[in-house]
Amino acid sequence: MAAIRKKLVIVGDGACGKTCLLIVFSKDQFPEVYVPTVFENYIADIEVDGKQVELALWDTAGQEDYDRLRPLSYPDTDVILMCFSIDSPDSLENIPEKWTPEVKHFCPNVPIILVGNKKDLRQDEHTRRELAKMKQEPVRSEEGRDMANRISAFGYLECSAKTKEGVREVFEMATRAGLQVRKNKRRRGCPIL
């Protein structure tokens, strides 16, 4: 039986952990060097609830320089992973300010999974000290859950690509969300612009 194909697009601020999350899930290796993404695609197979799904993973650049290029990734999207970094409260602030309006404009009705990346840094002393200098602290789980409710996300999960904690769960939830396409519409993804 052929696998069901679904398209997942990941968005969020630059350096918030999007590419690491995709690479750890699809290739099971953590990239130690940060190279800003312009545009990358990965394919990963996943089984959820007895269904074989081929996930096309579309990585995007979070940097503002790519704001005009990024919408080219959106057509026919089945599910969005909207990411912030737990060690960057500013990246959480950009979820309602930048990412939600952009995604809801280009992908109305496409389910959004809000993902808190770099969970391992929440208890990291160096991270806490650096944030304290700016009178900030790592994002708390309840802040993430509140944001997910605020933007009407399908769900909220936290993970660490570095330790692999929670990575598979993110993609299982995303796949389930992508499979919940209403049967009465042939295709519910983002329209082609």
UniProtKB/Swiss-Prot annotation:
Gene Ontology MF terms in the entry: GTP binding; GTPase activity; protein kinase binding
GO CC terms on record?
cleavage furrow; cytosol; endoplasmic reticulum membrane; extracellular exosome; nucleus; plasma membrane; stereocilium
Establish whether keyword rRNA processing is in the entry. Answer: no
- Residues that the record marks as modified (Cysteine methyl ester) are 190
Can you summarize the PTM annotation of this record?
(Microbial infection) Glycosylated at Tyr-34 by Photorhabdus asymbiotica toxin PAU_02230. Mono-O-GlcNAcylation by PAU_02230 inhibits downstream signaling by an impaired interaction with diverse regulator and effector proteins of Rho and leads to actin disassembly. (Microbial infection) Glucosylated at Thr-37 by C.difficile toxins TcdA and TcdB in the colonic epithelium. Monoglucosylation completely prevents the recognition of the downstream effector, blocking the GTPases in their inactive form, leading to actin cytoskeleton disruption.
Chief localisation class: membrane
Q: Where is the lipid attached (S-geranylgeranyl cysteine)?
A: 190
Is-annotated flag, keyword Lipoprotein?
Answer: yes
Q: How does it sit in the membrane?
A: Lipid-anchor
The processes (GO biological process) annotated in the record are: actin filament organization; apical junction assembly; cell migration; mitotic cytokinesis; positive regulation of canonical NF-kappaB signal transduction; positive regulation of cell migration; positive regulation of lipase activity; positive regulation of protein-containing complex assembly
Record-listed GTP binding positions = 12-19, 59-63, 117-120
Pinpoint motif Effector region by residue range.
Answer: 34-42
Q: Which Gene3D superfamilies match?
A: P-loop containing nucleotide triphosphate hydrolases
Q: What compartments host this protein?
A: Cell membrane; Cleavage furrow
Which family does the entry's similarity section mention?
Belongs to the small GTPase superfamily. Rho family.
Could you give the subunit structure recorded for this chain? Interacts with RTKN. Interacts with AKAP13. Interacts with DIAPH1. Interacts with PKN2. Interacts with ROCK1 and ROCK2. Interacts with ARHGDIA. Interacts with RIPOR1.
The free-text function statement in the UniProt record for this protein reads: Regulates a signal transduction pathway linking plasma membrane receptors to the assembly of focal adhesions and actin stress fibers. Serves as a microtubule-dependent signal that is required for the myosin contractile ring formation during cell cycle cytokinesis. Regulates apical junction formation in bronchial epithelial cells.
This chain belongs to the protein called Rho-related GTP-binding protein RhoC
Q: What is the lineage of its organism?
A: Eukaryota, Metazoa, Chordata, Craniata, Vertebrata
